[in-house]
Regions:
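Short, conserved loop/helix-junction motifs that constitute active-site signature segments
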Residues: 68-72, 134-135, 159-166, 236
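Conserved beta-sheet core of the metallophosphoesterase superfamily
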Residues: 151-213
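Active-site regions of enzymes building and remodeling cell-envelope glycoconjugates
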Residues: 75, 105-107, 117-119, 137-141, ...
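Active-site metal-binding loops of divalent metal-dependent hydrolases
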Residues: 6-10, 49-52, 81-83, 122-124, ...
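N-terminal active-site segment of His-dependent metallophosphoesterases
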Residues: 1-63, 131-137
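Conserved catalytic scaffold of divalent metal-dependent phosphoesterases
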Residues: 76, 83-161, 189
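Metal-dependent catalytic neighborhoods of phosphoester/phosphodiester hydrolases
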Residues: 14-16, 48-67, 84-103, 153-159, ...
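Accessory, non-catalytic peripheral segments of nucleic-acid enzymes
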Residues: 39, 207-318
Length: 318
């Protein structure tokens, strides 16, 4: 049984994501990977690229090596586009020796690799001329390639080039639902951006006959909610939730910054056009703006104009 995961995107210090929460989630993920290996009698774990989100920091490397040292089953890691340093090069080349010396069960693959009736095409080789066509005598391929998500996301290579394989197991697209043609994506096990609702994340189990099934992880996620009051901004224990506070300018002026606040959103009911008469006073122009553009109620408009008038008189007296 082969376990296939991809797109871990180990990253610390992301905006609005507390580092302790992120570290805790990665460690929980590592444990769930081990649980899946034990439960399903997995003999090989393949990690299909974008294990890192970028060239890793020291703290991100610490998480990586914590995972590597505890690996108990044969594991193959190959690179994705986020590990690329330039075309046809990956920083995994620099991690290969230390990774394999730390735990001989873990192999880092940075060049096209063959085993029995399957092969691995790392991202560093994907864009070499003839890289796909030159892979012969295998029916199954592991790689990292962007597929299509209409209408905006287009494939990075002609996907018909993969038609020679019975199944291609690939990293890159973050949702299993983006599986297409003969290309199967496990999706990212962890949400890497904030979502409005909880999404399903998981992994692939590949049997000896190359049939596969998709299974879910149960991990905390990054969520964004829209509220109209700071009283609705409740800190959540499992998921990490941030909030957009929606209201008019007057309401939002009293909202203080906090770790739970993502942004303030001015809510407007109409797309009004401001029409000003040349005979209007500044107070009248301000009243029109507050009423028809910012859509404040009459009491708030009167209060703001009163403050403006008082300050104007003081300025004229100085």
């Amino acid at each position: 049984m082969i376990l296939f995961t991809a797109d871990w995107h180990i990253k610390l210090g992301q905006k609005n994501v507390p580092i302790p929460w992120a570290c805790s989630r990665y460690k929980l993920f590592f444990q769930q990977v081990q649980d899946a290996i034990d439960k399903h009698d997995v003999s090989l774990h393949i990690i299909g690229g974008d294990l890192f989100d970028r060239v890793p920091s020291m703290d991100e490397l610490t998480l990586y090596f914590d995972f590597v040292k505890d690996v108990s089953v044969d594991t193959i890691i190959f690179d994705g586009n986020h590990e690329a340093t330039k075309k046809n090069h990956t920083f995994f080349t620099n991690l290969k020796r230390v990774t394999e010396e730390l735990n001989p069960k873990v192999k880092v693959i940075t060049e096209t690799f063959y085993l029995h009736d399957w092969a691995i095409l790392p991202y560093a080789d994907l864009h070499r001329k003839g890289s796909i066509e030159d892979i012969d005598d295998v029916d199954y391929l592991f790689t990292h390639v962007r597929g299509e998500i209409p209408p905006h996301v287009t494939p990075e290579v002609d996907l018909e080039r993969f038609d020679k394989f019975k199944i291609v197991f690939a990293g890159d697209l973050h949702a299993h639902e983006n599986t297409q043609r003969n290309i199967v994506y496990p999706g990212s096990p962890m949400t890497t951006s904030f979502h409005r609702n909880v999404v399903k994340t998981g992994y692939l189990l590949i049997d000896d006959d190359w049939s596969w099934t998709w299974h879910e992880f149960d991990l905390p996620q990054l969520l964004r909610k829209t509220v109209t009051s700071t009283e609705e901004m409740v800190q959540t224990e499992w998921h990490h939730t941030i909030y957009e506070v929606e209201g008019d300018v007057s309401d939002l002026s009293g909202v203080k910054n906090s770790d739970l606040l993502d942004k303030k959103v001015i809510k407007r009911k109409t797309e009004a056009t401001l029409i000003l008469d040349k005979e209007m006073t500044m107070e009248e122009e301000l009243g029109e703006y507050l009423s028809y553009i910012l859509e404040l109620d009459e009491d708030k408009v009167k209060k703001i104009i009163g403050v403006f008038s008082d300050n104007s008189r003081k300025a004229n007296m100085e």
